[in-house]
């Protein structure tokens, strides 16, 4: 009878160990999925960094990578703390600032180089983001450079 009890206890213990292992496995799967999601979002961000100056359709990007648009936007927002569209706009404005600072291209040329088809829309968006027009931004850079060289 004592052997039977210890045999039953042993079975219960093995069963508990099995449950613990299964529980640990279920906890690990989301991590792998999260890592995969992070890799997918990093690839998306890299794609946007390389192609920000072209017309990018978030819907087409998501569909071509077998993602629903809502899932893609939600996961990208978790990855980058911004939506894909805002991320692309930010890349465009950042690169426009660099071009305004380092080139003599006019506003229309810069607008086209950073992916805007409409220079007026570009100027309005730039003003909204930076608090001044692209022309004012460039003039401010010239004034700052002149005052620093004195």
Locations of the language-model features?
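Short, Lys/Arg-enriched, Trp-marked, Pro/Gly-tolerant hinge/linker segments that flank
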Residues: 2-12, 19-54, 59-65, 78-86, ...
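Terminal helix-turn-helix DNA-binding modules in bacterial transcription factors
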Residues: 46, 50, 55, 59, ...
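Key DNA-contact positions within bacterial/archaeal DNA-binding proteins
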Residues: 70, 120, 135
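Core residues of bacterial helix-turn-helix
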Residues: 64-65, 114-115, 126
């Amino acid at each position: 009878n004592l052997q039977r009890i210890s045999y039953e206890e042993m079975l219960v213990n093995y069963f508990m160990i099995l449950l613990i292992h299964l529980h640990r496995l279920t906890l690990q799967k989301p991590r792998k999925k999260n890592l995969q999601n992070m890799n997918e979002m990093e690839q998306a961000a890299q794609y946007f960094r390389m192609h920000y100056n072209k017309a990018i359709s978030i819907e087409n990007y998501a569909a071509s990578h077998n993602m629903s648009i809502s899932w893609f936007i939600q996961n990208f927002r978790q990855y980058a703390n911004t939506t894909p569209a805002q991320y692309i706009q930010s890349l465009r404005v950042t690169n426009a600032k660099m071009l305004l600072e380092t080139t003599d291209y006019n506003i229309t040329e810069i607008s086209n180089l950073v992916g805007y088809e409409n220079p007026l829309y570009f100027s309005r968006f730039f003003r909204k983001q930076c608090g001044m027009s692209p022309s004012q931004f460039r003039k401010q850079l010239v004034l700052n450079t002149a005052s620093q060289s004195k």
